[in-house]
Amino acid sequence: MNRLQQRQLFLENLLVGVNSTFHQMQKLSINTCCQNLQKILDLLILHRTIHSPAFRLDRMQLRQMQMLACLWIHQRNHDHLATLDTIKWISP
């Protein structure tokens, strides 16, 4: 599997994780959703680091993916204040 295929597989796994987390957490707050997304991302990055250090993601890439995931959730929740709280929670 070449680098492009591995990256595509990683992104597909991330999208599946985001999607399943959103559907499981509808009754909870957006911050809870993002905390669960953080766990998913941590596991994916740990897996990637253990199995292929060349493909490990840096902190900035992790933050960008968290932000995209939270914006994705916001688009389905339409809760502006919750999104602002989440952005503050994500920010270093």
Swiss-Prot record:
Family matches, as InterPro entries: Rotavirus_NSP6
Cysteine disulfide links: none
Subcellular location: Host cytoplasm; Host mitochondrion
Pfam families, sorted: Rota_NS6
A cellular component annotation (GO) from this entry: host cell mitochondrion
UniProtKB keywords: Host cytoplasm, Host mitochondrion
Quaternary organization: Interacts with NSP2 and NSP5.
Family label: Belongs to the rotavirus A NSP6 family.
This protein's name: Non-structural protein 6
Classification of source organism: Viruses, Riboviria, Orthornavirae, Duplornaviricota, Resentoviricetes
